[in-house]
Design a protein with these regions (language model features):
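Short alpha-helix capping/helix-loop boundary micro-motifs
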Residues: 62-68, 149-150, 248-250
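Bacterial N-terminal signal peptides
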Residues: 1-9
Length: 266
């Protein structure tokens, strides 16, 4: 499903690189339990068997072939992976329905972006695979509340919370970009409660959240928050709210992530 190869580095070689720690620390497991998508509440990806539908929606089948479809599973749908064989995986949904999906239709890759550490961490389930230095918003200490501007630089903030990659942009002005689903439904409710956006704007954002589609980006809450390239590699604060990594690191993230990849920003 992912077609981009990182130069001469194969995904197999990357997967064999040692994690930051040979064993997953308790702290990493605690973080993993908070790495959730909109649809994945508590167990999150700390469970080695918990995956999610990635890239695009997929069909759940009764048998490990495409002859007996059961239902369509949307992107970000959490599933428990039971076993895999011959490019098919047996999975169980949250409501207990069991069936088969193509092995390439699910993933357990997720991202944690730490404003305090100025780092981006990439995990596969509970395993920390890679750490990247990252640049964050001009105001590195506060959560995002509204759109920033040259006259409101304090509001150039990186939003905190649970997001997912809603779009991948290979032609970004910042090399490549993973667009996050900010503002989320919770951002919209808070913005409406605080008088920042209108009722219709709130409802449009909530509707997009429910459809698992790109939310409106033109309200006073701001938008187009991305993990993108052209970062300094020096862990500074200069963006208007995005997370910037070097282009080399962006290539790595681009290879491993898909639409639906969970992103925890804290």
């Amino acid at each position: 499903m992912l077609a981009l190869v990182l130069g001469a580095v194969s995904p197999q070689a990357f997967a064999q690189q040692p994690a930051a720690s040979s064993a997953v620390s308790t702290a990493s497991q605690d973080v993993a339990t908070r790495a959730v998508t909109r649809s994945t509440p508590a167990a999150a990806l700390a469970d080695r068997q918990l995956f999610y539908v990635a890239g695009e929606s997929t069909m759940l089948y009764n048998t490990p072939d495409d002859s007996r479809p059961v239902r369509r599973l949307t992107v970000t749908t959490p599933v428990q992976r039971l076993s895999c064989e011959d490019e098919w995986c047996e999975v169980r949904t949250d409501d207990g329905k069991q069936g088969f999906v193509p092995e390439t239709a699910i993933s357990n890759i997720w991202i944690r972006a730490s404003k305090a550490d100025r780092r981006v961490y990439m995990y596969r389930g509970t395993r920390l695979m890679k750490t990247f230095k990252a640049d964050f918003g001009y105001n590195a200490f506060s959560d995002k509340e509204r759109r920033g501007s040259t006259s409101l630089r304090d509001h150039w903030r990186t939003p905190e919370g649970q997001f997912y990659v809603v779009r991948r942009n290979p032609n970004s002005q910042f090399y490549k970009a993973l667009v996050l689903n900010y503002p989320t439904a919770s951002d919209a409710r808070r913005g409406y409660r605080n008088g920042i956006i209108s009722r219709s704007e709130r409802d449009a954002i909530i509707e997009a959240d429910e459809r698992i589609s790109m939310p409106p980006m033109n309200t006073e809450l701001g938008g187009w928050v991305e993990i993108h390239g052209d970062g300094t590699g020096a862990a500074t604060n200069w963006t208007q709210g995005c997370v910037a990594v070097t282009n080399e690191d962006m290539n790595t993230l681009w290879w491993w992530t898909q639409v639906g990849t969970p992103v925890l920003v804290e």
